[in-house]
């Protein structure tokens, strides 16, 4: 086996080496020595773990993103030591896996001795003002989440990092390092390629590992996928794909591999926006047509106002304050029957990751607008209450999937500290967020009839969007031409 050094960069807002990071490092340790570099201080338990399984552990100031981490690691190791390795791997925590035996990938690439450096996947060329610099053009490149450098280019590799400047933003990191690394060394005459062959997808997707991760894992032998698949902003995802990539990836990992994907999701939940994860993973279920033999335990307003402990193996029903107006009318109509509540409670048995369930948002368009307005009004109070409970969570502009009116069903195990006093509207927003902090998801449910109607509502919304699109494009061209004429007249 080749002598390899794996420089693994990790960052976690709470200073942890989480479950997915540990799994990746332990698997990679079978194919090389691991130099673990962390942006920011590690928590004591995570530091002890890293020191126990890695060759070297470096904790550095949280500056410069991945560029700063790689640079400090390379410079600390030094050129003389780097030259003792056949390959140096740059890898970071944004990848999850491996799925399967990672040694098989290295064995395949060992059969490509003509390459001077190689990567896992590539990003294809695209126009981008955000990442493309002055020319607004991103070249085709190896993605920086996994790059392997061989010994014959090690001197130039070391010089590259000696000269590397620390980026001040994520955009700078991509623009000045990730999109330039491949071209820089190719211009010096070094040959490169990627392990995963996606040439046939280049005309469809600029970023295949995000657009079709399940395809790359199942059919292309790719041993890794992006954590971000599960929390990327869903509106962005819909501009690129049909929005099903993350759910397909999860189902594949859960049913056809041994990868502990639920451990990854439990690690992501406390540090990523709940709404984005719920949308990407489609945490929405149709009520099972069962007898509903396990009715949830009803918690009345007096009990909720005082706060209460919960039995971990029990399911509880929390009635929400009644809303006013036409929205309140539709919320009241969406309140499940006793049978539907019992059927919904059975969903907890089928989905161990779910800690909170509630009725889906009514189809009346005003309910969605009213929920978004209420969330913006209540978010500061919710954030303050989370801080008082010592539960720091990222709150997004998009509201959490619940509450939607009517009631909430909660799994007792999702609230080991019990429920805090719940009286005001901002209090009830805490329920899905506290479950999230404890590593549990929130999901919505509805009857099959409402789900069928939802498809028609979606069709109507998409038709309206298509009608508006040409108008906005015309407005855009008009503004662009006006700005061009103003610029020309100023010369």
Regions found by a protein language model. Give the residues of each.
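ER/Golgi luminal nucleotide-sugar-dependent glycosyltransferases, focusing on the catalytic module
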Residues: 1-491
């Amino acid at each position: 086996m080749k002598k390899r050094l794996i420089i693994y960069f990790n960052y976690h807002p709470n200073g942890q080496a989480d479950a997915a990071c540990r799994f990746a490092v332990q698997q990679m340790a079978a194919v090389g020595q691991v130099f673990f570099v962390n942006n920011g201080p590690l928590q004591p338990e995570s530091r002890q773990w890293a020191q126990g399984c890695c060759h070297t552990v470096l904790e550095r100031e949280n500056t410069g993103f991945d560029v700063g981490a790689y640079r400090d690691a390379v410079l600390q190791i030094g050129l003389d030591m780097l030259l003792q390795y056949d390959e140096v791997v740059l890898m970071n925590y944004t990848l999850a896996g491996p799925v399967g035996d990672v040694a098989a990938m290295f064995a395949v690439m060992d059969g490509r001795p003509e390459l001077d450096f190689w990567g896992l996947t590539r990003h294809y060329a695209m126009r981008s003002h955000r990442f493309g610099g002055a020319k607004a053009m991103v070249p085709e490149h190896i993605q920086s989440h996994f790059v392997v450098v061989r010994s014959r280019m090690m001197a130039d590799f070391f010089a590259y990092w000696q000269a590397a400047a620390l980026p001040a933003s994520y955009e700078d990191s991509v623009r000045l390092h990730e999109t330039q690394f491949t071209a820089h060394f190719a211009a010096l005459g070094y040959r490169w390629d990627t392990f995963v062959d996606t040439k046939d997808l280049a005309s469809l997707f600029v970023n295949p590992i995000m657009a079709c991760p399940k395809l790359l894992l199942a059919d292309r032998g790719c041993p890794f996928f992006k954590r971000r698949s599960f929390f990327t902003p869903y509106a962005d995802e819909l501009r690129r794909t049909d929005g099903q990539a993350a759910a397909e990836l999860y189902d594949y990992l859960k049913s056809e591999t041994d990868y502990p994907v639920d451990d990854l999701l439990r690690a992501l939940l406390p540090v990523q926006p709940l709404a984005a994860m719920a949308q990407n993973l489609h945490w929405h279920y149709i009520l099972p047509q069962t007898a509903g033999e396990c009715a949830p335990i009803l918690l009345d307003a007096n009990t909720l106002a005082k706060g209460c402990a919960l039995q971990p193996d029990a399911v509880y029903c929390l009635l929400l304050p009644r809303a006013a107006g036409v929205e309140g009318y539709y919320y009241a109509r969406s309140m499940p029957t006793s049978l539907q509540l019992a059927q919904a409670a059975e969903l907890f048995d089928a989905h161990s990751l779910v800690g909170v369930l509630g009725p889906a948002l009514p189809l009346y368009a005003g309910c969605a607008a009213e929920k978004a307005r209420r969330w913006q009004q209540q978010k500061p109070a919710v954030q303050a209450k989370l801080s008082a409970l010592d539960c720091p969570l990222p709150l997004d502009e998009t509201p959490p999937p619940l509450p939607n009116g009517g009631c909430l069903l909660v799994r007792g195990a999702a609230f080991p500290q019990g429920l805090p006093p719940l009286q005001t509207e901002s209090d009830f927003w805490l329920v899905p967020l506290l479950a999230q902090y404890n590593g549990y998801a929130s999901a919505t449910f509805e009857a099959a009839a409402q789900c069928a109607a939802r498809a028609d509502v979606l069709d109507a919304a998409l038709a309206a969007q298509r009608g508006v699109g040409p108008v906005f494009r015309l407005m855009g061209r008009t503004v662009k031409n006006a700005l061009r004429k103003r610029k020309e007249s100023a010369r």
